[in-house]
Amino acid sequence: MNIQKLIIAALTATILPTSLNAQQTFNEMMYSKEKTMFILNAPTAQKSSVTLRLYKQGQGGKAYKTLKMKKLGDERWEATVKGDLKGKFYTFDIGKGETPGTFAKAVGVNGNRGAIVDLYDTDPSGWDKDVRPALKSPADLVVYELHVRDFSISPTSGLKYKGKYLALTEPKAIEYLKNLGINAIHFQPVFDFASIDETRLDKPQFNWGYDPKNYNVPEGSYATDPYSPATRIKEFKEMVMALHKAGIRVIFDAVYNHTFDINGSNFQRTYPDYYYRKTKDGKYSDGSGCGNETASEKPLMRQFMLESVKYWIDEYHIDGFRFDLMGVHDIETMQAIREMVNRIDPSIYIYGEGWSAGSCAYPTEKLAVKANTQQLKGIGAFSDDMRDALRGPFSDDHQGALLAGLTSQEESLKFGIVGGIAHPQVDMTKVNYDKEPWTNNPTEQISYVSCHDDMCLVDRLKASIASLTDKNIPEAIRTAELLRIDKLAQTCVFTSQGVPFILAGEEMLRDKKGVHNSYNSPDSINQFTWTNLQKYPQAFAYYKSLIQLRKNHPAFRLSTGDKVRQHLEFLPCQQTCLVGFQLKNLEGIDAWKNIIVIYNFNKEAKKMQIPEGNYTVACCNGVINEEGLGFVSGKEVEVAPQSALILYQK
């Protein structure tokens, strides 16, 4: 293709309405009983070089039919095959290796061949009546980050469909999640990824799944039959429907920033080098840390992301999107996605990691990094300021912070408490990573202390706080301290403004045996330890009460920066490792008129000045009771060691 054609194609892609352009570009297989039409957008393919192959199996065997595709006038290639092809498989080949295309919607085992299915056949009974759980504000979300296999694979889970989508449809699983109180599950990758051999599921295999292969097909290893293209689709929908009936939203982990590899990717085998960024010296850029980075700023990649997000919403009823390494993507694309989603349903929440894993071959000021979040209207980002203020830096598992009783992180925590907005009582010169506020509203901050990346909370606490692993200290005392600190950590998360987020299993003091990066660790490391519910019942009870406390009180869920500045005031304090604030003048907002929250990270009880008055104690020394644990009066209170104190006035 000459330069003039490239320019015209780029201009056309920019000018044409996104929906029309995407539909023309990415609708690669159109099935009917009478015929199936195949269309591939392959602008650089040479004349008479695009081959369509049809197979009877999803893997193995020779093609029973081979056709040369005809070039259309707009750099697309077309072939039509008469007859009912349902149940057959196909590949495209432009001379770079066979591929199911960039936008396959059904595939065979291991995702190497596209599958010809009638998607209506994959809808479970009642799917047309499936309803997205209501959501007034992102601040009302309680996000639970979950790996499908982790949740149910343990022999102690008591679930039938271990490691499968269907485990999340079983009554025991649903009741557990409802009892905990979460209302949104962020699933780690559930698209078809390359790092699990679906033909060897008799052999234990594990991977988080951040290895994209087919972006628009559910992963087959979580289905009861990965050889059946329709099964993975139907069972995924059954899972979504069961969660929706339980009032739980489903959030999709969108890993558009890289592919598993380059040469074997569907992008590269369809339009070589187009979908990836390169450095000035012609090498593939690696802002993802995975060997490549995609070029979201290019028209076709942008359209691909838009159409993919829309497809997961339309076909699978997805309720939110978490963008992996969002900082690799450009601001314009992320904003286009937000605007498109707003037209579908503005309650669909979008957030992501406001960083990359390396240097990107694109100007930083144009990337969706955390520092540019204020340009991303209605898109949230993870607060590493808050995370590291509590537990210590990402770069050193053994370095603690406030939870270890170490000082100097108070302002960073305060910045997290207000939801990353500008607040007159937060000294930005003392905040961890940001010297300017990066959100306009608290709903643009994900508040958290741990996630799937690096150590889980229990392991991190043990690695950074010596007394938790000191064998000279009786185990009962060590366990009691671990529980105190763990509860304190999550109290900070759930009583802060923003969108609270927890790693699944932390409510039962889940650990990963100290493994820092368990992306491919065996089940013995990653699986839930369900027996912990009997071992540490007070942990689950506290998490449940904490979640309910937040749900019951809108004061912890203020939706705008102005409301936070109006109602949240920090208490004066000259002591270290002690942070307190009041939510005041809440008439018309909350049943509690004034709320006092104090976090004591010290190993000794501490006293703090509060506005003089009579208060009911709702949380004290690791116990929550909204009806009241007692009463205090005056202008000074004592806070137990390594715990939170919550008081209120009606």
Where are these regions (language model features)?
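Conserved alpha/beta catalytic core and glycan-binding cleft of carbohydrate-active enzymes
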Residues: 114-117, 121, 338-339, 347-509, ...
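Catalytic cores of secreted or luminal carbohydrate-active enzymes
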Residues: 534-560
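Substrate-binding/active-site clefts of carbohydrate-active enzymes
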Residues: 147-171, 175-316, 326-345, 349, ...
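Conserved, mostly hydrophobic/aromatic
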Residues: 40, 92, 146, 187, ...
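Bacterial Sec-dependent N-terminal signal peptides
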Residues: 1-24
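Carbohydrate-binding surface patches
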Residues: 34-44, 569-611
